A protein has these predicted regions:
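Residue-level recognition of single "structural anchor" positions
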Residues: 1-338
C-alpha cells in the first residue's frame, strides 16, 4: 500500500475518472486536461534529457573522486554510464547532483524556474506544471540548496544603500502579552537587512525584532567595500558600520523621508527593493519561516544580473550539474514535514 504521508493531491485526477458515461463536454475537458498532464509528464526516454546530459563530461568519480573512468553502456533512457577504474562503481553525470534518479524531465524544471522567477507561488506553479504541491516544494528546496552560498561573494561598492524591512512570523508563532500582540518591531517580526549598489542586491536575515549594532555589522561588514559612499536612513546601528568600514555617510532622518514623494526620495531604489521582496514573500504566503534565508537568496538571484530569465535558467542548470550534493524527497519531508 502506498504511503501518502508526504504526498498531496495528484494533479492527474479528474472528476470523471471512475465514470463509464460522461457528457460530450466533460469528455472533451477530461481529454484535454489529460493531454496537458501527460505532456508535462513524458517518460525521460521521450525527452531530450539524455542528448543534453551526454554532452557533459564528468570531472571525476562522484564516489571516490578518482580521475580515471571508462564508458560503461547507457541507462534505459539513453544516458551515458561510466565505471570508475579505482572504486569500480558505476555512475552517470547526474550521480550525486539534484538530478540523480530524477523522474521528471529537465524541461519541466526549466518551466518551473521561469514561473518561479515570475513570482509564481508554489501552489500556482504546481497547477501550471501539473505537479503535486509536495513535488513543487521539494523542487524549491533543491533550488535553495543550490543557492545556499550564492550571496557569499557579493560585495557592494561605490554608492551603496542599505535599509531594513520586517516580515511577520507565522500566526501560530505570534507572541502575545495579556492576549494582545506585542507592539512595534517585536519578536513577532523578522528583520531583513537589504543593501544595493548600481549592480547588485544583497539580502540577509538578521534575526527577529529590531536591528542592532551587532546585527547590522554581522549582516553587512563582509559585503560592503571599505571607503564606499553609504546612503541610509540614519538608523543608529548604521553608524557603527560606517565607522567599521570607514564609509562616507549620507544619512536622512525617517521623518524627513516620509514627507517626500517616491521620485524625490534619495532611498527610493532600496525602498523599491523592499516592496518587491514583500511582494515575493507574500506570493509564498504561509511558507516555512525556517527557510526564509533560502527565499532571500533566491530573491537576490532573481534581481541580480543577468536580467534575462533564460540566462538565469542556464546558470542554474550548469551549476546544478556540477554541484555534488543531492537531496531525496523522503529525506526532505522527514526533516521539513510541512
Amino acid at each position: 500500500m502506498k504511503n501518502n504521508k508526504y504526498h498531496s493531491h495528484s494533479r492527474r485526477k479528474t472528476p470523471w475518472d471512475e465514470e463509464e458515461e460522461v457528457s460530450d463536454v466533460a469528455s472533451f475537458v477530461r481529454d484535454e486536461y489529460r493531454s496537458h498532464y501527460f505532456y508535462h509528464h513524458r517518460p525521460l526516454s521521450e525527452t531530450g534529457d539524455s542528448k543534453l546530459l551526454n554532452k557533459f563530461i564528468p570531472q571525476s568519480c562522484p564516489y571516490c573522486h578518482g580521475k580515471k573512468y571508462k564508458r560503461n553502456g547507457h541507462t534505459t533512457y539513453g544516458l551515458q554510464k561510466y565505471k570508475c577504474i579505482d572504486c569500480k562503481r558505476n555512475f552517470t553525470i547526474t550521480t550525486g547532483t539534484i538530478f540523480q534518479d530524477h523522474k521528471l524531465s529537465i524541461s519541466e524544471w526549466i518551466e518551473y524556474l521561469l514561473n518561479l522567477f515570475g513570482y509564481s507561488s508554489i501552489n500556482l506553479n504546481s497547477r501550471i506544471n501539473k505537479n503535486s504541491e509536495t513535488t513543487s516544494k521539494y523542487w524549491l528546496a533543491k533550488i535553495f540548496m543550490l543557492l545556499s552560498d550564492y550571496q557569499k561573494d557579493i560585495i557592494l561598492s561605490d554608492c551603496v544603500m542599505i535599509d531594513e524591512t520586517y516580515y511577520s512570523v507565522i500566526k501560530s508563532d505570534i507572541i502575545t502579552k495579556d492576549k494582545k500582540k506585542l507592539r512595534g518591531l517585536s519578536k513577532n517580526k523578522y528583520c531583513i537587512g537589504i543593501g544595493c549598489d548600481d549592480q547588485c542586491l544583497y539580502c540577509k536575515l538578521e534575526g527577529k525584532a529590531k536591528t542592532s549594532d551587532t546585527k547590522t555589522v554581522q549582516a553587512f561588514k563582509e559585503h560592503i567595500r571599505p571607503y564606499s559612499h553609504l546612503i541610509h536612513d540614519d538608523e543608529k546601528s548604521h553608524h557603527v558600520l560606517v565607522q567599521a568600514l570607514h564609509l562616507k555617510s549620507e544619512s536622512y532622518k525617517s521623518t524627513y523621508l516620509s514627507e517626500l514623494n517616491d521620485k524625490d526620495n534619495p532611498l527610493d531604489k532600496i525602498n523599491h527593493y523592499c516592496d518587491l521582496l514583500k511582494k515575493f514573500l507574500n506570493a509564498h504566503l504561509g511558507f516555512n519561516r525556517e527557510e526564509l534565508q533560502g527565499y532571500l537568496n533566491l530573491f537576490s538571484f532573481m534581481l541580480n544580473p543577468p536580467h534575462n530569465k533564460l540566462e538565469k535558467v542556464e546558470i542554474l542548470l550548469k551549476f546544478a550539474l556540477n554541484y555534488r550534493k543531492t537531496m531525496t524527497f523522503r529525506g526532505y519531508y522527514m526533516k521539513n514535514p510541512y
